[in-house]
């Protein structure tokens, strides 16, 4: 998992509340568990004018010109601005995989669905909760300003606007540590590889029958 400390980037505003995981990545794309390759199908039913299927080359599909991610001014955005209850609906880690695979490192919203919120941290995506008034202000500024960018400082827990306004956010210290170090659950476990190895060696001495081959 790529470490995340400071993110500076273009913001894209998705002005919809209750965006569920089926909208983020439709169910027909859930067969793969590789974590990669989902980016082109992010928001598939909103992004394209035809019906998407696994294996379909998205480069030749008709784009929906009204969908915000397709607008030229937002190309290359790595910060998604959203509304309340982002990531609700069925539990699918693929929703986070699709966002990360499409280049997003941060999602800012007034609230997130609990499971999506947890999955985001496990996959290197920073979900930032700001109060509704602050989010509404960011929507107005993003839509009014071409190339609107934000600076996200995870160590300082701050969002800074181009005008220099600082918006603090809170985050669990353990999750913050994992994001900054680029540690998923496997990486976190491997930090203790020496202790695990020592325990296994000790168990072989204390309880050798557990290791006997039948």
UniProtKB/Swiss-Prot annotation:
Subunit-structure text: Heterodimer of LeuC and LeuD.
Pathway: Amino-acid biosynthesis; L-leucine biosynthesis; L-leucine from 3-methyl-2-oxobutanoate: step 2/4
Protein name: 3-isopropylmalate dehydratase small subunit
A Gene Ontology term for the protein's cellular component: 3-isopropylmalate dehydratase complex
One Pfam family it belongs to: Aconitase_C
Catalytic activity: (2R,3S)-3-isopropylmalate = (2S)-2-isopropylmalate
Domain of life: Bacteria
Transmembrane segments: none
The entry's keywords: Amino-acid biosynthesis, Branched-chain amino acid biosynthesis, Leucine biosynthesis, Lyase
Annotated EC: 4.2.1.33
Gene3D superfamilies: Aconitase, domain 4 (3.20.19.10)
EC main group: lyase
Family, as annotated: Belongs to the LeuD family. LeuD type 1 subfamily.
Gene coding for it: leuD
Species of origin: Nitrosococcus oceani (strain ATCC 19707 / BCRC 17464 / JCM 30415 / NCIMB 11848 / C-107)
GO terms, molecular function: 3-isopropylmalate dehydratase activity
Function according to Swiss-Prot or TrEMBL: Catalyzes the isomerization between 2-isopropylmalate and 3-isopropylmalate, via the formation of 2-isopropylmaleate.
An annotated GO BP: L-leucine biosynthetic process
